[in-house]
Each structure stands twice: as structure tokens, then as C-alpha cells.
């Protein structure tokens, strides 16, 4: 078993729902934080984030919804989030144009090297 500490950024270019992270099929991810920033100079933007549970017919569970004020950031997962193989995180924002950006910090537990 290998544990790799990683970061992955995202930008919301449109207003549709976007998958910003998918846990690999041979691993488990422990998400430490998902920082989300509104880079707009003057307007608040509504942001939604969902956990997509691959073991439950890809049912989506909202874990974050907030009107982010202009030029602010927030940790959308202050208690962390655990993802199993195939689980995903989606983001949707009321405004596109890369105004909403973020960073996912996580530990990826790779099980491909296990015996048995």
C-alpha cells in the first residue's frame, strides 16, 4: 500500500455541473480540504458541491452550498471527506468564466501493490 499526498486545482469555466475529482479505481482518497475561491471583483457567486457515491448508483449528495462573496475563499470540507474507488466530487457555480477556482488537497491510498 502506498500513500501519496497530492493537490489538484480546478476552474469553473461554465455554469454547468463539472466533475473536478474522481477517485481512481485502485485506490481510496482522504480529502483534507477543498478550498474554493471567488475571484470576481464585485459580485457574490452561488457555488454547490456534491459527493457522487459510485456504490449507490452514482447518487449525488450535496455537502456544500454557499454564496461566496467577491474576492473571498472558503474551505468547503472543514471536516474532510473520504472517497472510495470511483467516487467523485462535482462543482456547479452560478457564474462561469473561471471566476470560481479551487484546490483539492488529499491523500491517495494506492492499493494496486497489495498482495492477496
Task: Give short role names for the model-derived ranges.
Residues 45-50, 58:
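A short, structured beta-strand/loop element
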Residues 38-46, 94-100:
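Extended, low-complexity, turn-rich repeat/linker tracts enriched in Gly/Pro/Ser/Thr and Asp/Glu
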Residues 52-56, 110-111:
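Short edge-strand/loop segments of extracellular domains
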Residues 48-52, 103-105:
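Beta-strand signatures of extracellular beta-sandwich domains
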Residues 37, 50-54, 92:
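A generic structural motif
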Residues 29-38, 88-91:
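A short beta-strand element within beta-rich, extracytoplasmic domains
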Residues 1-29, 93-116:
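C-terminal interaction-tip segments
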Residues 55-88, 94:
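Intrinsically disordered, low-complexity Pro/Gly/Ser/Thr-rich segments with frequent PxxP/GP/PP motifs
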Amino acid at each position: 500500500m502506498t500513500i501519496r499526498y497530492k493537490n489538484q486545482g480546478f476552474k469553473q469555466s461554465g455554469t454547468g455541473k463539472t466533475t473536478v475529482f474522481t477517485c481512481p479505481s485502485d485506490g481510496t482518497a482522504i480529502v483534507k480540504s477543498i478550498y474554493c475561491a471567488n475571484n470576481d471583483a464585485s459580485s457574490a457567486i452561488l457555488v454547490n458541491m456534491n459527493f457522487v457515491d459510485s456504490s449507490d448508483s452514482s447518487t449525488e449528495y450535496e455537502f456544500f452550498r454557499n454564496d461566496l462573496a467577491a474576492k473571498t475563499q472558503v474551505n468547503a470540507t472543514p471536516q474532510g471527506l473520504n472517497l472510495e474507488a470511483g467516487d467523485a466530487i462535482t462543482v456547479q457555480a452560478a457564474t462561469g468564466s473561471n471566476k470560481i477556482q479551487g484546490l483539492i488537497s488529499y491523500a491517495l491510498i494506492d492499493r494496486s501493490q497489495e498482495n492477496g
